[in-house]
A protein has these predicted regions:
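Short catalytic/signature loops enriched in Gly
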Residues: 3, 141-144, 237-323
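Conserved ABC transporter NBD signature motif
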Residues: 64-74
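P-loop NTP-binding/switch modules centered on Walker-like glycine-rich loops
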Residues: 57, 176-180, 184-265
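ABC ATPase NBD coupling module
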Residues: 75-92, 118, 240-245, 275-281
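Conserved ABC ATPase "signature" region
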Residues: 74, 125-145, 254
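A short, proline-enriched helix->beta-strand linker immediately N-terminal to the Walker B motif
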Residues: 169-173
C-alpha cells in the first residue's frame, strides 16, 4: 500500500541578514491514511517549519528543497493555484494559537461557512447546515446558537474546537495539528485529544501532531519522530520511543517528564541550550549537550535503521541503551 504522504530529503532554509538558517535538515518520513505521527522536540527544532513547508506557508525568505509526495502529487514548489486546491480540501491545519487564529471581526458561523463556500461551492443555506453539523461533531454545546457569536465570546477550549471544526469541514485526508493544546488547561487538553481520536476513527483522517508535550503524543500517536536542530534524532512507534528510546536526546526528553510516582527531589533536565542554527556545532548537533559524546561525534552520523520500524541518528551502539 502506498503511503498517503511520503517526505524525502526535505530541507527548509531561511535567508537572514546574518546568514542562511537551515531550519529543517534532510527530513524523511512516511504517513499512512488513518494513522498519526507525532513530531516532538524543543522549541526551534524545526517542527512547525516542517508543517509550513508541506502547506506552502513559509515566510517570504524561506525556501524548500527535497520531496513531499501527497497521494502521488509533489507538494514542494507546487504552483500556488494548485496548492490552494489541496489546502483545506485534502490537507488542513490547526494553527498553534486558537486565541489569535480566528478573525475577531467575523462571527464564527461566517468563518466556517466561508470555507465551504470557497472550496466546495456550497450555497449559504447548505454551508450553514454543514457548519452546524461539524460544530456538533466537535462537541460544541448549542452549536446553532454559537454560529452567531464572535470569537471573544468563546473560551480557549471552545475556540480550539472551532479551529478543529474548520479544519475538518472539507473532510481532509491529512490534518496537521500544530500545538493544538497550547494554553489550554489539562482537562480541556484531554477533551481535545479524545475528540481528535474520535474524529480520526470517524473520518479515517491521518494526523501529524506537532508538540513538545510528550503526554499528548503518548495518548494519540502511532509513530513518533524526535527532532533536534532541524534533524531527526530518532523515529519509531510510540511504544518504541516511550519505552525503549535509544538516542541520548530521546532518553533525556523521557527522563525530563515529571512523574507522579517518582521519588526524585529534583526535576531531571537536559544540560545546556539548543544550538544557534546559524552556528551549529561540528558533527552531531546534540554532542555539546550529550553526556555520552565521543570524538566520533565530531562527524555527523546518518539516520540508520536498527530495529523493525525504528531509526536513530547516533554513533553510539544501540546496546549501550538497551541493556
Amino acid at each position: 500500500m502506498n503511503p498517503l504522504l511520503d517526505v524525502k530529503n526535505l530541507y527548509v532554509r531561511f535567508k537572514t541578514p546574518d546568514g542562511v538558517v537551515t531550519a529543517v535538515n534532510d527530513l524523511n518520513f512516511m504517513l499512512n491514511a488513518g494513522s498519526t505521527l507525532g513530531i516532538v522536540g524543543e522549541s526551534g527544532s524545526g517542527k512547525s517549519q516542517t508543517a509550513f513547508a508541506l502547506m506552502g506557508l513559509l515566510a517570504a525568505n524561506g525556501t524548500v528543497e527535497g520531496s513531499a509526495i501527497f497521494e502521488g502529487k509533489e507538494l514542494v514548489n507546487l504552483p500556488k493555484a494548485e496548492l490552494n486546491k489541496i489546502r483545506a480540501e485534502q490537507i488542513s491545519m490547526i494553527f498553534q494559537d486558537p486565541m489569535t487564529s480566528l478573525n475577531p471581526y467575523m462571527k464564527i458561523g461566517e468563518q466556517l461557512m466561508e470555507v465551504l463556500q470557497l472550496h466546495k461551492g456550497y450555497d449559504k443555506q447548505t454551508a450553514f447546515a454543514e457548519s452546524v453539523k461539524m460544530l456538533d461533531a466537535v462537541k460544541m454545546p448549542e452549536a446553532k446558537k454559537r454560529m452567531g457569536m464572535y470569537p471573544h465570546e468563546f473560551s480557549g477550549g471552545m475556540r480550539q474546537r472551532v479551529m478543529i471544526a474548520m479544519a475538518l469541514l472539507c473532510r481532509p485526508k491529512l490534518l496537521i495539528a500544530d500545538e493544538p493544546t497550547t494554553a489550554l488547561d489539562v482537562t480541556v487538553q484531554a477533551q481535545i485529544m479524545t475528540l481528535l481520536n474520535e474524529l480520526k476513527r470517524e473520518f479515517n483522517t491521518a494526523i501529524i501532531m506537532i508538540t513538545h508535550d510528550l503526554g499528548v503524543v503518548a495518548g494519540i500517536c502511532d509513530q513518533v519522530m524526535v527532532m533536534y536542530a532541524g534533524r531527526t534524532m530518532e523515529y519509531g512507534t510510540a511504544e518504541q520511543i516511550f519505552y525503549h528510546p535509544t538516542h541520548p536526546y530521546s532518553i533525556g526528553l523521557m527522563d525530563a517528564i515529571p512523574r507522579l510516582d517518582g521519588n526524585e527531589e529534583h526535576l531531571i533536565t537536559i544540560p545546556g541550550n539548543p544550538p544557534n542554527l546559524l552556528h551549529l556545532p561540528k558533527g552531531c548537533p546534540f554532542s555539546p549537550r550529550c553526556q555520552f559524546a565521543t570524538e566520533q561525534c565530531q562527524t555527523a552520523p546518518k539516520l540508520t535503521a536498527f530495529n523493525e520500524g525504528q531509526l536513530r541518528n547516533c554513533w553510539l551502539p544501540v546496546e549501550k541503551f538497551t541493556l
